[in-house]
Each structure stands twice: as structure tokens, then as C-alpha cells.
Amino acid sequence: MSKQQYRLGIDAGGTFTDFILADHQGNVQLFKAPSTPHDGTLAIRNGLAQIADALGRTPAEIIADCDLCINGTTVALNALIEKTGVKVGLLCTDGHEDSLEIRLGHKEDGHRYDATYPPAHMLVPRHLRRPIGGRIISDGSEFSPLDEAAIHAAIDYFREQQVQAVAISFVWSVRNPSHEQRAMAMVRAALPDVFVCSGHEVFPQIREYTRTSTTVVNAYLSPVMGRYIERIDALFEELGAQQPTRYFQSNGGLAPGVVMRERAVNAINSGPASAPQAGLCVAQPFGIDNVITVDMGGTSFDITLSKGGRTNFSKDSDFLRYRIGVPMIQVETLGAGGGSIAHLDDFGMLQVGPRSAGANPGPVCYGKGGVEPTVTDANLALGYLADGALLGGSIRLNRQAAIDAIRSKIAEPLGISVERAAVGIITLVNLSMVSGIRRVSIERGYDPRDFALIGAGGAAGMHVMRLAEEIGSKVVLIPKVASGLCAFGQILSDIRYDQLTTLPMRLDDEFVDLEQLNQALQQLRERGMTNLRDDGFGGDNRIECQYSLEIRYLGQIHECSVELSCDRLDRSSLAALRESFHQRHKALFSYSEPNSPVELVNLECSVIARLQRPPMPELATPLKATAAIPAGHRPMLFNAQDDWQDTPVYNGDRIEVGQIIQGPCVIEEATTNILVPPGWRVSLDPSATYELTPGH
């Protein structure tokens, strides 16, 4: 860190906005404020006021003393989910107006052959997709000139329709962007207040549908993201921030607002994408680099997998039914949070989620007007949370209200007890989360028994051990800052810019053009370095370039991404690259064809400026071991067939390093509870992380 004292991470979630403040002495503090979806700056102001009160300083003094303020946000994600983006017009090559609906000729995976599955909502209605004459062909040459009269006509129509953003995507613009560049200039000149983006800039790789879809999503979200960034930047400027606010990207890196307001598609997973970085940091003191990080907040349940210290990425994938081409940390998101609503479906079956009570009105026990029981209400009814406890330091829980809601909405209609209904709610939400974990592990060739489970989010501590039992994980790690782990991950992250290009080329020795290939790698690297310099980084920072090549067997239509360990290829490293591709193909598809020719399709280069991390917490180890003493006991129910148990409750602030506590018990931290079920034990590590393992 620099001479400034603090680094601040802010994660704006659906229910709470989390603040992590770290200083240069290893102190990490967590604060929470209820989210304000209508204006994110209100939650940030409230959180900064809490921090100021705790430190005896003003918000302006704290911000002025921060070397970096980082914001992860769900603004872009929520706009895509709720369809609250802006009105978009599309300029496309004549004859390609329907590519968004034709897609790849089928629906997304999981519904490919389901004739009853409805088509995705189109972000650009048919009448706003305007065909433009002119054609670039695959070698980059102009087959026919751009029809500027058609562009003028489209501009007039967009003006009449009050379009707020224009996406431009022409065929083969990745080989020659001149037509897109001319169209952009014309639209910007005629419609100066309208946001404009083009496919060759947003996603400069082949495949028309993916490029068009990604560009349209970017146009749909960027004005929304831009307004949010404008308010946040103004707030921090008002408070005297020494550096521009950095925003967390879906690729796990940071970028300034001036970049993110133009590339909102890179912020779709801005919130949950920081969790795996934090998960790896939490696991490091234990010598673990295979982790599955699960983040259960009030609204959703996010799952990421990291193997060997590297987090899985997705690219060219369907996200909320829209094809997104840009690289993103692979996050599996479920509608399973503390605020997920339990209800009976049309057949009288108990269901949990995906609807959520959110921050307002929230669960019934919040006393803010909620009437439908949630997962949090069930946890409170079963004794895992304390009646009258302050959630997040500000919301007092009402157990009787939770019990009454479960009785009237679930138990009585089903003819069962409140206890059985509450256990059923917890069981169902756990099964849903286990299914999600299996999708990111077993279905992608990973054995979850080889991974530690990292619990993040305010609600995860009450569920994660049951999830570990189901998937066979033998280690669960829950840091004291678990409920703010995404904000914690933000302060550990680096500046990152991804550069992409397409370069079709046979990789056989007799066909490959190493000079052209190395020149393309150098150009990507230089573009990324330019981005870093424009962002004010690159001088004193350690720069790292990570390369990956998308390769396939000749004639295939999909590629495998293979990492390149050098920044320049020769004959020897080319042979090693081909062998790495064969191995990767076999790992993914169970076979390889070493004697078949292979071809390169795409190149990627991630240019990263490594930032100095703030030091991590280090708790003192007592000279003499003592037994942990419960702060009290309360009845809890762990199974519908069992009796209530008088269960010890421990105050997390009084647990010392090295003390081993046997379950069942609950550990109460300021912003989360950890449920240790029967058959598990827990101890506190000097890194301020609870380690939970099965056994006595």
C-alpha cells in the first residue's frame, strides 16, 4: 500500500452493502448498511457514516486517507434481470436482422430440445433492427461499399423512436472495422446524446451472433451503468478521494469509471466475481489451493471454483439467456439466499425461491412489512439465530413473527407442524445449493471431495456444513469477515485489461506463420500496456501478461482454451502448445487425436498490474490453551425427527486461537452466525478464519 492509511472495498449487494476497510497494520474491519437500490450512493453514505463513527473521524478524512476505493456492484446485473436497461437500436448487415432470434439455431443448453420453452426476451425489438447495405468479407476486403443513405435513414428513425443507445455489428468487422467505424462516426455526429458502441470494439473476435449479442447487451446496460458511476464518482470526489474510484469487473480485475461506463457488459458479474480471490486468500494459510467459494447473501447464492490457485473462467456463454462473449469469472448463481421466499406452488408443493424478499420489505422477522416466510425466518424459528438479535447491527429479529408466518403460510396449509415446515424450508434450500455446487464441479470434471468449501455471505455460516456433508468436502473455512467476503476480495485485486483478437491459422509446422503469430501477441500486449498507462499504472507496479489461445482440431466448430506460458513462440514451444491442447481436449472430452492437424482461432492477452496488498490479519496465539466457554444456551432443532436440544452458543469475540469446539453449537459473530451441526468441530486459526472439520 502507499503512504495512505486505508484501502476500502464496497460491495453493493441486493440486501446489504458491505464495506471492508483495511489499514497498513493488518487491521480489517467490516461494516454493513442496508442497500438502497433506487440510489446506491445513499447506502454508501450511510456506510461511510458508520465507519466514521467507529473511527472517530469524518467520512471525508477517511476517504482522503484511502489509497484506493473499490466498488463492486450489481447495477448492470439487476438491469439485465429486471429488463430496466435503455431503449436500443441496432445497425446490422443487410439480411442479418434476425440473428439475435436465430441465435445458433437452437435454444441454450438445458432447453435445446424443449419446444415449450419460450424464446428469450429480445433487448432490441424487430423494428429497431435496421439493415445496412455494404459488406466486408472474411479476408477483410470490401465486397460492396457501405450504404450511408441507409444509415441516415436509420438515424432518423432512431431519433423518432427516442432510442437511447445504438449497437453496431456488421459481418466480419473483426477483420476490417472500417464500415463500423464510419457508421459510429455518423451516429455520434447526428445523435450526440445517444450511447454508441460497435462489435469490433466490444468483442473483437469471430462469430457474428456472439459479437452482436454482446454488443447489444453492452448498449442496453452502459447508460444505466454510466449514470450509476457518475453518481459514485461525484460522491467520492466530493469527499476528497485521492484516486479515481475503481470498479470491479467480471474478469476479476479493476478498471476506472471512464472505462466501465463504456463497457457495462464487463460488469455483469461485478459483485460475485471478487469472491474467489478472497476464497483463495482465506485458504492460503492452510496450504489449500483447491477451493469452492459459496456466497450466500440475502438474495442469491453464488458459487465459484478455483483449482490449483486458478479460478475458472467462462467465455462465449449464455448468461440470463443472452450470449456473452467477453471473459468472465465462472459464477453459478441461484435464487437461494436468506431472503428467498418459501411458498406453496399450484400443486401444493413446498418451494423455496427464486423470489426474494430482498432488503425491503425483507423477511417477516425484520418487522418491515414482509408477510411471506423466508429462509432467514426458518433459521430463526429453529433457534439458529437469536430472538431479538441485531442483524447487520441494525435490524432486530422477531422470532414469533417468523413462527407465525411459517405457521399460516406453510405449516397449516400442509397440515404439519411449524418445526417440520421450517426444517423442510432449510432442507429444500440446501438441496438447491448442493445441485449448484455439483454443476460447477462434477459436471465439469472436478471431484468436490478434493476441494475445501469457503463460506461467504451473511447467511452461508448456517448452511455450509450441511452442503459439505452432501458433497463430501472434508474442510470448511469461514473467515470472520465472511459476510463481507466479496468486498474483502476487492481490496486484494489488481488492475486488469483483457485484449482479444481473431487469427485463424494452422498450427502444423509446415503451415504456421510464427512471425505473424508473435506479432499478434505483441500487439495485444502493447494494447493492454497502453490501457494500464492511461489508467496511471505500469511504472512502480509489477506487470504480468497472461496469454491463452483458443485451438481446435481442423474442422471442429468449438475451441479449447490453452494457456501459453511464454510471450513469444518458437518451434519448441509451439510443439509444447500442441501437446497441451491434446491434453486439454482429452480432459474435457475424454479423447484426443494427436495425429490430426490443429488450428488456432482466437488469441487473448490479459495485462495485469499487480497492486501491493494490504497486510492480512494475524491473531495472537495464547501461551496457554484454555477451553472455550459458552456465552449461553438456547433450544435448537437439527432434524424434524429429533427433539429440541439445549445447544451452547459462543461469542466469536471471546474464542481464542487454537481452541477446539465440538458441535452442535452456534458461534455468533457481529455480522454472521456459524452453525456447527452434530459431528463437526471448529477451531479458530491465527488468520482470523474458522476451520471446520467432521469428527470428534
UniProtKB/Swiss-Prot annotation:
Activity is dependent on the presence of ATP and bicarbonate. The requirement for bicarbonate may be related to allosteric activation through conformational effects, but it is also conceivable that carboxyphosphate is formed and acts as a mediator in caprolactam activation, forming carboxy- or phospholactim. GO terms for biological process: glutathione metabolic process. PANTHER family: 5-OXOPROLINASE RELATED, HYPOTHETICAL 5-OXOPROLINASE (EUROFUNG)-RELATED. One of its GO terms (cellular component) is cytosol. The tetrameric structure and the presence of a connecting tunnel suggest that the activated lactim moves from the CapA active site to the CapB active site without release to solvent. This is Caprolactamase subunit alpha. The caprolactamase is a heterotetramer composed of two alpha subunits (CapA) and two beta subunits (CapB). Its EC number is 3.5.2.-. One of its GO terms (molecular function) is ATP binding. InterPro entries: ACX-like_C, ATPase_NBD, Hydant_A_N, Hydantoinase_A, Oxoprolinase-like. It is an enzyme of class 3 (hydrolase). Induction: Induced during growth on caprolactam. Belongs to the HyuA family.
